[in-house]
């Protein structure tokens, strides 16, 4: 889809993206580098989508010499005009800002250097909601607060408690590294109790050259690696920024912080933590405890987060990718890809399945690429691998012919570990290596299928229990995920004759939180798995003591919701999304909900059979279920055809109405799609747009119509007739 007409717009108003606004960075190198400014520029520009009303960075060289560069403006501009690109140094602390507390001024830009009681500096992303109270407190304690920015309040608050802790030890011990680090850790714990809000922060003590990255309700990622013969530790609000420098990641949970320099890191809890574990007692971690963690190689590749020609916009690229991502999710429904199943059958026939399975497991256990490559290449060089390749080439030509097609690894690798195996191919094209990598991927894919099917079984058990106890099922989500939940309510009602109640977190808290009962079910939907409002609801439900099961549908399974808060977590498998407007995740969410509705209908049918229900009814329900299972296979092709056939029409209509001041998208039943369409308009061109139930339009919204309102196509009667025909077809499918 060509979006070039949007370049005519000359709008400088930032798009507010609540929950993702602002981004923070902390990079520590093993030695002073002349390239630190270049690294910093790359990182800041990678975070530009999170905020661009101001940009800043602190660069520390040696002997505690620091340079602060910040101003109003976007990273893509300021990295040059501020001279960020030319900076040398050993430590970089940076931030891009979408303004919340404090107007858009240089003073309110981050990072902040403070020296009231002790010399530290830092920045944050998120919101400290008690900023005014903190400012009064800090001023009363003698701090020199120069802005209204909540990031400055955070840095001063840490400084305040850091000074308190240092005052408890002898003055001649203040600069003993171990003592000083212990004081800073306790300061972070104490400061976190004083501050209210959701944030991620980076704090630097220039004396010890230690960096502290704190995850308190906002996304934060940490990785270690080497660049230009320089070891480093890197914290960022954005995963893709870290992946540009390293694939070795350390998973941080909400409530944890990491203390690190270029060579070492340690993770601590700044509050008491209770971690859910499947089929095990909850893991209890006490405040201040050190948490043992090892770096793990990311399953994502940097290429997965890059704009690939001919696309000019991430949103355009991700819309096109819906064909592939929905197809890969559907393959999970079907028990795996055809190529994967055929490969595993071949491995079993040739009696090397177990050996290949062991090789794959050993590769995935290693956190170092060189060690992984050594295992892979050892088997590749073996006589057994040569014999396997010969047999495939001579006796399994259908597999071999597919193997040598262009872009095979992009089209036919499906497992969550696929990028690990693709990386092992390195840059040169080797058919034997490709065959081995595909074999490993196929084994891993079937493992994914088993895990997915187990999650679905657990989901159905929970839903079945809720139905038998006549209890409520709530879906709770924000933004695009909420709109997908509205579509889910339609699917569950039409297909499974089951009511679910879709809620925004605020509505749930106000309308349902006090009336929950045992055997109710909460289904949280989140692309990131880090949606703070949703995490708060899950925490409240858990604290209630009621016997309520909590389910999560998430894209990022290594997340707070995916790993720590849910009884069952189900992946949506849409891959990374870079564009702020969610596209792939919405399609995969509603595809997954459609499948879950079918599975619940199937469950009800099985119960009806056990109860010796009407045979005519059973046959009719079975026929409908078969139709729906077949309709799932058509989804990727339907998306592909829709993109192809509507391209010109969308471009034409968009070019005509993108400057209209107000748009209304009306729906009958499919209100979730209408609301999502309106959100996409607001996110991309900043128009006012609303999506709503068509019958409600006359009850208020029509009062704002005027002579400049766009009502629709010229031939309204013809449009309505076609629209009704489309609706009839849609409802036959639904």
Q: What does each model-found stretch correspond to?
A:
Residues 154, 169-173, 182-186, 601-648, ...:
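Internal, active-site/partner-interface "lid" segment
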Residues 5-471, 642-646:
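Conserved short alpha-helical segments that host acidic/polar catalytic motifs at enzyme active sites
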Residues 162-166, 175-178, 247-248, 255, ...:
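A structural-propensity feature for long, helix-poor, extended segments
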Residues 361, 374, 380-381, 387-418, ...:
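Glycine-rich phosphate-binding loops that contact phosphosugars or nucleotide phosphates
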Residues 42-45, 111, 218-220, 227-229, ...:
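Short, solvent-exposed amphipathic alpha-helical segments in soluble enzyme
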